[in-house]
From Swiss-Prot:
Pfam annotation, one family: UNC-93
Localization, UniProt: Cell membrane
Gene name of the record: UNC93A
Chief place of localization: membrane
Coiled coil (residue ranges): none
Name of the protein described by the UniProt record: Protein unc-93 homolog A
Protein family (similarity comment): Belongs to the unc-93 family.
Domain of life of the native organism: Eukaryota
Membrane-spanning intervals of the chain: 8-28, 42-62, 65-85, 86-106, 140-160, 202-222, 257-277, 291-311, 320-340, 344-364, 395-415
Membrane topology designation: Multi-pass membrane protein
A GO-annotated cellular component: plasma membrane
Origin species: Bos taurus
Stored InterPro entries: Ion_channel_UNC-93, MFS_trans_sf, UNC-93_regulatory
Region feature Disordered, mapped onto this chain: 438-457
Length: 457
């Protein structure tokens, strides 16, 4: 196996192991630690840390440590989060969440930079077009990485499946589930017995082991790389703090970006709702915590499959059709969740919603990044720093108000953000279509550069 492909596979399986652990834990935070809103407070803090670090930390760390050791250091932050869950309290989870937030932006920036460098190295070696090889390597990475949502949630459901079978849930309790839930943000998940501490420790032990394996795999087998510099140029230095910070906000002078910041915020809002509210107020409330993993498997599988499908489909349809599909799908889900009264007798419905949600999320993850890559090609670093910043802000706001609002209100907020984001996107699409080079949608997909393909934590 040639060296560059080996490095891509090492990176991919390292992320698979890491996010098998983190993804499963994130899905359970709001259900396991619902007392006083600790779970959602931890997630809000996490994304707050990411929001701040995304403005300046990634280029500084990558410049000082290189991509490989930035990846290893950032992964250690995720392992610390798993360890913090062993003794979950405000004094352990909140600092651990800050660490993950600080490491997340650096992790994804280093991942994108590394894949771009090895893709271009392979292209020079074989005489291929650079962007084609980079696109191929990103495709391999996400094909492997996206399955982490399946494995992490499968592990949690199998472990918690050892819990004693609970009795019939009282009808009056079911009436408080779903959009009607206004109490479970501050009360324990009362629809199911909390898993025994032994089961929780077993799950955390498995997740922590996956994290340590990821760090070990990257530290031992991933080869360090450096971006090739044109002849006569000095080695590229990490930009100073103020330069990075200012370039991020200076790009907001562009009217198109000011309109498009609603798209990454929507991505943050909708992911936060599914992992923080749907898992707790619909699944845990009506079925039990042991079903959280299974419903999130549907989300992860649908997201992964549709990401691959939409990436190919966009070449033929353009982005506009896919944005419309994502908006209509998410709109239908929001309206249905407002009206639906979850009940254990409707078991298949619990899996349909996250599957459709995953399809819509696949649109936002693939097409938002492609859109930013095309519109702001000359300022891609600042553009994607803005993307990470505004998506993180969406997470922070959504998790921040999670303990204070009824689920129905959160759904109306999400509906408003979706409507505003689509209106803003339509305005940009219309403006671009009037330019001499034709409609933006005709641009098809363009392989993203330097971390421009994924912003998920």
């Amino acid at each position: 196996m040639e060296g560059n492909l080996k490095n891509v596979l090492v990176l991919s399986f390292g992320f698979l192991l890491l996010f098998t652990a983190y993804g499963g834990l994130q899905s359970l935070q709001s259900s396991l630690y619902s007392e006083e809103g600790l779970g959602v407070a931890a997630l809000s803090t996490l994304y707050g840390g990411m929001l701040l670090s995304s403005m300046f930390l990634p280029p500084v760390l990558i410049g000082k440590l290189g991509c490989k050791w930035t990846l290893v250091l950032a992964m250690c932050c995720y392992v610390a989060f798993s360890l913090g869950n062993f003794y979950a309290s405000w004094y352990t989870l909140i600092p651990a969440s800050v660490l993950v937030g600080l490491g997340a932006a650096a992790l994804w920036s280093a991942q994108g930079t590394y894949l771009t460098i090895v893709g271009n190295m392979q292209a020079r070696k074989t005489g291929q077009v650079g962007k084609d090889v980079v696109s191929q390597y990103f495709g391999i990475f996400f094909l492997i990485f996206q399955s982490s949502g399946v494995w992490g949630n499968l592990i949690s459901s199998l472990v918690f499946g050892q819990m004693p079978t609970q009795g019939t849930i009282p009808e009056e309790q079911l009436q408080a589930c779903g959009a009607s839930d206004c109490l479970m943000a501050t009360l324990s998940a009362n629809s199911t017995n909390r898993p025994s501490q032994d089961l929780i420790y077993t799950l955390l032990g498995i997740y922590t082991g996956c994290g340590f394996l990821a760090v070990l795999l990257m530290a031992v087998f991933l080869e360090p790389v450096r971006d090739a510099q044109p002849e006569g140029e000095d080695e590229k230095q990490a930009p100073p703090f103020w330069s990075t910070l200012l370039s991020t906000f200076k790009l907001l002078r562009d009217k198109r970006l000011r309109l498009l910041i609603l798209l990454p915020m929507l991505s943050g809002f909708e992911q936060a709702f599914l992992s923080g509210d749907y898992t707790r107020s619909y699944t845990t409330c009506a079925l039990g915590i042991q079903f959280v993993g299974y419903v999130m498997i549907c989300f992860g599988a649908a997201d992964a499959l549709c990401s691959v499908l939409f990436g190919r489909l966009a070449r033929h349809t353009g982005r506009t059709v896919l944005f419309a599909l994502g908006a209509v799908t998410q709109l239908a889900c929001i309206i249905a969740l407002l009206l639906w009264k979850p009940h254990p007798s409707q078991l298949p419905v619990f899996f349909v919603f996250p599957s459709l949600w995953g399809m819509a999320d696949a649109v936002w993850q693939t097409q938002n990044n492609a859109l930013f890559g095309v519109l702001f090609e000359k300022n891609k670093e600042a553009a994607f720093a803005n993307y990470r910043l505004w998506e993180a802000l969406g997470f922070v706001i959504a998790f921040g108000y999670s303990t204070f609002l009824c689920v129905s209100v959160k759904l109306y907020v999400l509906l408003g953000v979706l409507s505003a984001a689509m209106a803003a996107y339509g305005a940009v699409e219309y403006t671009e279509s009037r330019k001499a080079d034709g409609p933006l949608a005709a641009g098809r997909t363009k392989p993203a550069e330097d971390g421009a393909t994924q912003t998920k934590l």
